[in-house]
Amino acid sequence: MRKWITLIAIFIISLCTLSGCSNSKSLYSDEGQVFRKVIPQDMTTLDTTLMTESVSSDVAGQVFEGLYTMDKRDQAEPAVATKLPKKSKDGKTLTINLRKDAKWSNGDPVTANDFVFAWRKVVDPKTGSEFAYIMSDIKNADQVNAGKKPVKDLGIKALNKYKLQVKLERPVPYINELLALNTFDPQNEKVANKYGKDYGTTADKAVYNGPFKVVNWQVEDKIQLVKNKDYWDKNNVKLSRVNYKVLKDNQAGAALYDTNSVDDAIIAAEQVDKYKNSIALNKRLTAGTFFIKLNEKQVPEFKNKHLRLAISKAINKKQYVKSVFNDGSLASNNFTAFGTSKTPEGKDFASTINSPLKYNEKEAKENWKKAKKELGKKKVTFTLNVQDTPVQKISAEYIKSQIEKNLPGVQMKVKQLPFKQKTNLELANNYEASYSGWVPDYPDPTAFLQTMTTGNSQNNTAWSNKEYDKLIKDANGKLLQNEDERNATLQKAERILLNEAPVAPVYQKGEAHLTNPQVKGLVYHMVGPDTTLKDVYIDKSIDRETGKKKK
């Protein structure tokens, strides 16, 4: 088996060599200070106003820099801003000074106007940003996005070249972390206007102000970064290169690790035991949850609450994560993930929710019986869209077997699609059911719960609940200064969502990584971008096999 895996790695490397992996050094070369990482899917854009998925966000976190970034404790720290915001007494006006040495990779200075331009672009209805709702706390953002006010009325103003004023609809306790999101990053107006709709579609149609810049992006193959010599803090960036290899097959990623072709790779469930004694193996639980979206618009039967509940309860999730992943993933019965935020008492918010969606074959059958009676039919058929990866294929087969075994008369078909195509179908509401996931962008339950409100671009299930919408509105408004009441309101909202079951939670994502012990300073985040690579360096005095100092 090991010989076969090695042959796979050699084959992959050979293909890369023949096609010319980069302009200078091979994608897999470990010469100098280079970090080589396998990623499970490609990014979709380099335009921060259009980003909706985790890989684009993660790469953006290395090549762009906003007012703030997340530290290793997932708290905001100054980046382009010189310090945390100065707040008015009512907490609704922020004054932010910018560092004068921040530059774009074309040499232009990063100015307050770059933030004004980018934020206005996000909420401009012409942009069609799926993340415009993230800016709802900024004064007039929702009205601008709805076309009811001009973009100039957005609550951001350049007081001078290096000073910003931000006006909020309401005081927001997590505003510093919110401003660390990629959606709030600046854009160079001159460059963005030059390329128009093509901005960010290729490596050379963008400029960068982060620690690194993209020099090579070959779709569904690789992304290569180099150190940004115009970055204000370049003297503290030790890596000269970052190479991402797109691989949908985790077994192939392990093969590349074994041949010293990459420094970090997620491995498949069946490989975990093989590496259980390896210094390279580490498991981490992310705050990402995976669930089945049930589209009531395309499948009218999904309007029946009992059918939705039956599907949620019919899946043995503990058995699923054990047999399919073996990587630290958790069976999930909640929508808001563990690790997202804490209650005023210091408890994990997710731990305070008693979900009705636990696996229960008997209850699932009872719900299905009620659904059949109310629907007046004994059979329901729908298609589940999943990503075209080996693990998602296995996942779909497992879910299909559970639903069809425990709910006789329900037939689930499976359609595998490239990630971008699957996502676009979701956003267009052109799907029946979709195996989807969500990672919180800031440390608050609303990072999840907001996405299921009526009209939210991520809520493409056609489910709508007025009470739920009001609870989220109150939590984002009048209750922001009342921690206890706000927490109780969000708990109630989560319970409504789970009892209505417009989505069927399946698992909270874990990852089993093989990481080169020479890699130092690597930070993983529970919220926001997956990693921070600014402080990473390769300590070649460490033995890659043992993790100990070389003799």
What are these regions (language model features)?
Residues P85, P356, G409-K422, L449-N516, ...:
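Extracytoplasmic/peripheral linker and loop segments enriched in polar/acidic and small residues
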Residues V116, A132-E189:
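Surface-exposed binding/hinge segments that line
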Residues L168-V237, R241, Q251, E545:
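Gly/Pro-rich hinge or "lid" segments in bacterial periplasmic/extracellular proteins
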Residues A331-A371, V391-K393:
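Structural transition elements
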Residues E361, K365-P440, G455, E511:
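Ligand/substrate-recognition segments at binding pockets and active sites
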Residues H513-K551:
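Long beta-strand-rich cores associated with HINT superfamily self-processing modules
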